A protein has these predicted regions:
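Extended, hydrophobic alpha-helical segments in both membrane/secreted and soluble proteins
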Residues: 66-69, 80, 104
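Membrane-interfacial segments
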Residues: 5, 9, 33, 60, ...
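Hydrophobic faces of alpha-helical transmembrane segments in multi-pass integral membrane proteins
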Residues: 40, 44, 48, 62, ...
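Alpha-helix N-cap/start motif
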Residues: 77-78, 112
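Hydrophobic alpha-helical transmembrane segments in multi-pass integral membrane proteins
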Residues: 1-7, 78-82, 130-139
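Juxtamembrane and boundary regions of transmembrane helices in multi-pass small-molecule transporters
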Residues: 88-89, 93-142
């Protein structure tokens, strides 16, 4: 049974659902430059981090789609991983679905709404820096 599972993972069926998903996404994003596609990957990962805070869980769900999508859109896989890492990183500072954040705020007796008021400018600076980093990565072929 284990060999059959490995064979299925290594050689997916010709008409796998993932192929349909990849085709649809790539057609929707076909006119974008590599830089714009990479930035959209970052934005998607940042938003997705709200729903799946776990970095490894997020990678397991999104990277099987993001890595081949990067290939189709002319973005290196390294840059797609960078977009994933940055998208997973900074939004952890504000997402209310993060147990670590909410637990830390509870111990410090800080309301989440007050935390957002305090953090939004800093998070904006971090996100602008992340976009610049991604654009540089695309420009140098990282």
């Amino acid at each position: 049974a284990q060999n059959a599972l490995l064979k299925t993972i290594e050689e997916p069926p010709e008409y796998a659902v993932i192929n349909t998903i990849m085709y649809g996404i790539s057609q929707a994003l076909a006119g974008l430059s590599g830089a714009a596609a990479a930035v959209l990957m970052y934005v998607f990962q940042s938003v997705f981090n709200f729903f799946v805070v776990s970095g490894s869980g997020q990678a397991a769900i999104t990277m099987p789609i993001m890595a081949p999508l990067a290939d189709l859109l002319g973005v290196s896989r390294q840059t797609s991983v960078l977009a994933f890492q940055l998208g997973d990183a900074f939004t952890n500072l504000i997402v209310p679905t993060s147990g670590c954040l909410i637990g830390s705020l509870a111990i410090a007796k800080i309301e989440w709404s007050n935390w957002i008021k305090f953090m939004w400018k800093f998070l904006g600076i971090l996100m602008i820096g992340a976009v610049i980093t991604i654009l540089i990565a695309v420009a140098i072929g990282f």
